[in-house]
From Swiss-Prot:
<keyword id="KW-0721">Serine protease homolog</keyword>
<keyword id="KW-0800">Toxin</keyword>
<keyword id="KW-0732">Signal</keyword>
<dbReference type="GO" id="GO:0030141">
    <property type="term" value="C:secretory granule"/>
</dbReference>
<dbReference type="InterPro" id="IPR043504">
    <property type="entry name" value="Peptidase_S1_PA_chymotrypsin"/>
</dbReference>
<feature type="disulfide bond">
    <location>
        <begin position="175"/>
        <end position="190"/>
    </location>
</feature>
<feature type="glycosylation site" description="N-linked (GlcNAc...) asparagine">
    <location>
        <position position="252"/>
    </location>
</feature>
<feature type="domain" description="Peptidase S1">
    <location>
        <begin position="24"/>
        <end position="250"/>
    </location>
</feature>
<dbReference type="GO" id="GO:0090729">
    <property type="term" value="F:toxin activity"/>
</dbReference>
<dbReference type="Pfam" id="PF00089">
    <property type="entry name" value="Trypsin"/>
</dbReference>
<keyword id="KW-0325">Glycoprotein</keyword>
<protein>
    <recommendedName>
        <fullName>Snake venom serine protease homolog rhinocerase 2</fullName>
    </recommendedName>
</protein>
<feature type="signal peptide">
    <location>
        <begin position="1"/>
        <end position="17"/>
    </location>
</feature>
<feature type="disulfide bond">
    <location>
        <begin position="99"/>
        <end position="257"/>
    </location>
</feature>
<keyword id="KW-1199">Hemostasis impairing toxin</keyword>
<dbReference type="InterPro" id="IPR001254">
    <property type="entry name" value="Trypsin_dom"/>
</dbReference>
<dbReference type="InterPro" id="IPR001314">
    <property type="entry name" value="Peptidase_S1A"/>
</dbReference>
Length: 259
């Protein structure tokens, strides 16, 4: 398992070395072996993916609070939505954990949901966890985004396979300048391409932002239409919530979410 995780991190590093002129909008199809930690969320009624998430270990998934629905189904090991991988699995939540409640998030705060699975997933060729970050992210980092979100801006077009792209991590002030109403301080990250053309978009919410090989962000909110110049997207800052996440996983009943 360790060898496979290291190999996946190497794939991510090689992906960062590519030019960022790719079109999730603006991206290319992800390599099938690049995203074993990427999960897809849908409801029992609908097979259409409405969000993504990240597998932390065999029993826990991290995604955005805005992705909460009744009767969520979580798919693991998915690449092509129309072609089932031999190790593909589906699970349902046993527990959902939020900061206060599922309705208290905003586009700049507490958009995070930690899900405990009713039954652990099995390790597989296309199923492997991604660790929480050991260090905070650095402004200027090249970051990887991925998901089954729309790959066009004006007319929604959902791909069969997840798309990946490289974007840049900016100072939070860049997003404050781009969007009215954001507070002076926030536990969110600001990332994108200032020239436009590359961005996370519809259904990419909840998916990972991976900077220099570390899981640093959760897709939270982007401008509409997506991928516009000078309009980076907002991502929940995972590092700010690591104590809360680790406390819940350790069954620490006194742990609290950052204020």
């Amino acid at each position: 398992v360790l060898i496979r995780v290291l190999a996946n991190l190497l794939l991510l590093q090689l992906s960062y070395a590519q030019e960022s002129s790719e079109l999730v909008i603006g991206g290319d199809e992800c390599d099938i072996n690049e995203h074993p930690f990427l999960v897809a969320l849908h409801t029992a009624r609908s097979k259409r993916f409405h969000c993504a998430g990240t597998l932390l270990n065999k029993e826990w998934v991290l995604t955005a609070a805005r992705c909460d629905r009744k009767n969520i189904r979580i798919k693991f090991g998915v690449h092509n939505k129309n072609v089932q991988n031999e190790d593909e699995e589906m699970r349902v939540p046993k527990e959902k954990h939020f900061c206060v409640s599922s309705k208290t998030y905003t586009r700049w705060d507490k958009d995070i949901m930690l899900i405990r699975l009713k039954r652990p997933v099995n390790d597989g060729t296309h199923i492997a966890p991604l660790s929480l970050p050991s260090n905070p992210p650095s402004v200027g980092s090249v970051c990887r985004i991925m998901g089954w979100g729309s790959i066009t801006t004006t007319k929604v077009t959902y791909p069969d396979v997840p798309h990946c792209a490289n974007i840049k991590l900016f100072d939070y002030s860049v997003c404050r300048d781009a969007y009215k109403g954001l507070p002076e301080k926030s536990r969110t990250l600001c990332a994108g391409i200032l020239e436009g053309g590359i961005d996370s978009c519809k259904v990419d919410n909840g998916g990972p932002l991976i900077c220099n090989g570390q899981f640093q962000g959760i897709g939270s909110w982007e401008g509409h239409p997506c991928a516009q110049p000078l309009k980076p997207a907002l991502y929940t800052n995972v590092f700010e919530y690591t104590d809360w996440i680790e406390g819940i996983i350790a069954r620490n009943t006194t742990v609290t979410c950052p204020p």
